Amino acid sequence: MHPRGALRPVHRRGGRVFRALLALLAAVLLGGCAIAVDSGGGSSGGGSGSSGTDSPIDSVNRADLDEDERGAVSATNAYWRETLPDDFRQSYRPPRVLGGYVGEDGPSCGGQPSVPFNAFYCPSQDFLAWDENLMAAGYERIGDAWVYLIIAHEWGHAIQARLRADQVSVAAELQADCFAGATLFGAAERGLLRFERGDTQELQETLAAVADDYPWTNESDHGDARERISAFNQGAQRGVRACLA
C-alpha cells in the first residue's frame, strides 16, 4: 500500500478492481483467522509490549517505516479534507500529528502519560500519536497495511470529535474501524493511494490482531476480531455514511 506516485501512477479502472478487493478481503477475514504479533522479545507481559532486550524499532528499516507513516498521514488527511465538507457540510481542520514516540517518552494527554505499545487520539488537545515500537512490530511481521490501518483508525477518532453527538456511535472503537475502512478504500478509489498484492491479507492480519497483548489491540476496548472486521468492511463497502450512529 503506497501513496499515489510512490511507485507508479494509479490506473483508474472504475469500481470493479476495488469491489474485487473487497470481496477477497471479506472472504479471507470472515474465515475466523486470528494471529498474534509479538514484540520481538517474547510475551508482552500485562499489555506493555516492552519485555525483552531488543526493541522492534531496531529490527526494521526506519526510512521505509517513516515513508509509510508519512504516506498514511497524507492519504488519510487528503481523504477527509474532501469528505468532511462534501458529505457532512462542515469545514475540515486536521488534527495535529505528533507522530512517533518510543516507550514511555510519549506526549501526555489531559495530564495522563502515554502508554507504551499504543496509538491514540487525544481529544482534549486534538492530536494523534503512536509508539514507534507498535508500528515497527506490525510492520515487520505483517506489512505496511498495519501502519495505514492504525493511522486511519486513530484519525477516525479525530473525526468523531468533529461530528455532532448524534452522529457518534457509543461503540466508538468499532465506528473508528468503520471510518478506517471507508478511508482506505475511499482513498484508493480517488487515487490517493494504491493497493498492492498482499495488502488485503495484511489488513486481515491487522484486524485479527486482537489476540495481542498490546493496548491498541485490546479486545475489551476495541471489540473482537469479527466485530472489527464487520465494522471495517461496512465502511469499505458502503462508504463513510454507513458508519454513522
Q: Predicted segments — roles?
A:
Residues 29-32:
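C-terminal motif of bacterial Sec signal peptides marking the signal peptidase cleavage site
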Residues 34-57:
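Short, low-complexity, disordered segments immediately C-terminal to signal peptides
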Residues 38-42, 101-129:
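Catalytic zinc-binding patch centered on the HExxH motif and its immediate surroundings
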Residues 81, 171-186:
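An active-site-proximal "capping" alpha-helix that borders the catalytic cofactor pocket
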Residues 132-149, 164-170:
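Short pre-active-site segment immediately N-terminal to the catalytic Zn-binding motif
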Residues 147-162, 178:
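Catalytic glutamate of the conserved HExxH
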Residues 155-170, 183-188:
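Catalytic Zn2+-binding segment of zinc metalloproteases
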Residues 189-245:
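Long, well-structured alpha-helical subdomains associated
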